[in-house]
C-alpha cells in the first residue's frame, strides 16, 4: 500500500493557523490580565480626589468663667455707685472655616481646615456724674488635621463619615475699661479719668476632637457638607499685656479659659 503524503503547502498552512490561534489566545489572556490588574486602580481613581470646602458654623463653648468674671465686674462697679449694664454671654458665637480634603479611597480621607471666630461684648454707664465703658472679647484661630472614616453602609444620596481631629488652637482675649467722673474745677465741672485700662491675652495649645459629618451631592463635583462635633481645648491661664494709664505690665489672667465645646457647621464642597 502506498501512503499519500500531504503537500508542502498544506503543512505550512496548518502550522500558520496553529500559530495564529495561539497568538489570539495569548492576546486575549493579556487583555484579561491587564483588565484584572487595572480594576483596583480604576476603583481607587474614582475616590482619589482633592476638594476644597468653605463653611459657616456656630459654636457653644465652655466659657462660663468669662461670663462670671464679667458679671463680677458689673457688680463691683455697681457697689462703687456706677451701675453699668449686664454683659451679653460670650459662650455662643458664629465661626468661619475653609479647608482642603483628599479622598484616599472609598473608606478614608484626610483634611486640613482653618477656622476663625471672635466675639466682643460691651457694657456702659452714661450719667451726669460719671461715664464708664467696658469691652470684653474672646476669639480663636484654629488649624485642624482630620482623618475621616466612611462606613460602607450608607444611603446612595449622601456620604457620611466619622472624623477624629487634632489641631492647634491660637486663642486670644481682650479687656478694656475707660471711665471718667465729673469734678469741679472752680465753678466748672470737668471730666477726670478714674480708669483707663486695656489688656490683651494670647495662648496657643493643642486641641483634639471628634465629629460626624455628611456630604450630599447636589450635582457633579458640587456637594452640600454638614458636620457636628465636640472639641477639647482647655487653654487655662493666659499671659496678658496690660496698659494702665500708659504704663505697661505683664500679668497672668485671674481666670482660666476653656475653649472646649460643641461646634456645628454647614457649607459647600467643590471637587477639583
Where are the predicted features?
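Transmembrane beta-barrel architecture of outer-membrane proteins
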Residues: 91-95, 140-144, 205-209, 223, ...
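Gram-negative (and chloroplast) outer-membrane scaffold detector with strong preference
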Residues: 46-51, 58-60, 101-187, 218, ...
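Flexible, solvent-exposed loop segments that connect beta-strands
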Residues: 64-87, 117-140, 170-204, 237-257
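Short glycine/proline- and aromatic-enriched beta-strand/turn motifs that initiate or cap beta-hairpins
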Residues: 44-103, 263-272
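Predominantly the C-terminal beta-signal and adjacent terminal strand-loop region
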Residues: 218-272
Amino acid at each position: 500500500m502506498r501512503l499519500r503524503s500531504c503537500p508542502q503547502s498544506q503543512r505550512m498552512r496548518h502550522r500558520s493557523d496553529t500559530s495564529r490561534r495561539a497568538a489570539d489566545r495569548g492576546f486575549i489572556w493579556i487583555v484579561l490580565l491587564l483588565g484584572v490588574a487595572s480594576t483596583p486602580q480604576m476603583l481607587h481613581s474614582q475616590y482619589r480626589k482633592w476638594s476644597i470646602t468653605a463653611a459657616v458654623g456656630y459654636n457653644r463653648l465652655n466659657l462660663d468663667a468669662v461670663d462670671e468674671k464679667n458679671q463680677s465686674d458689673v457688680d463691683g462697679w455697681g457697689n462703687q455707685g456706677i451701675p453699668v449694664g449686664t454683659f451679653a454671654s460670650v459662650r455662643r458665637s458664629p465661626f468661619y472655616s475653609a479647608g482642603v480634603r483628599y479622598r484616599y479611597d472609598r473608606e478614608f480621607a484626610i483634611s486640613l481646615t482653618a477656622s476663625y471666630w471672635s466675639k466682643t461684648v460691651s457694657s456702659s454707664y452714661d450719667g451726669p456724674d460719671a461715664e464708664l465703658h467696658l469691652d470684653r472679647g474672646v476669639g480663636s484661630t484654629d488649624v485642624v488635621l482630620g482623618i475621616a472614616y466612611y462606613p460602607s453602609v450608607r444611603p446612595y444620596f449622601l456620604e457620611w463619615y466619622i472624623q477624629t481631629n487634632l489641631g492647634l488652637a491660637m486663642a486670644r482675649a481682650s479687656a478694656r475699661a475707660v471711665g471718667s467722673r465729673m469734678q469741679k474745677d472752680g465753678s466748672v465741672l470737668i471730666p477726670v479719668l478714674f480708669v483707663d485700662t486695656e489688656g490683651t491675652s494670647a495662648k496657643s495649645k493643642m486641641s483634639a476632637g471628634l465629629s460626624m459629618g455628611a456630604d450630599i451631592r447636589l450635582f457633579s463635583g458640587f456637594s452640600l457638607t454638614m458636620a457636628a462635633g465636640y472639641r477639647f481645648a482647655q487653654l487655662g491661664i493666659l499671659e496678658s499685656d496690660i496698659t494702665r494709664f500708659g504704663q505697661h505690665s505683664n500679668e497672668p489672667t485671674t481666670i482660666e479659659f476653656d475653649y472646649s465645646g460643641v461646634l456645628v457647621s454647614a457649607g459647600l464642597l467643590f471637587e477639583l
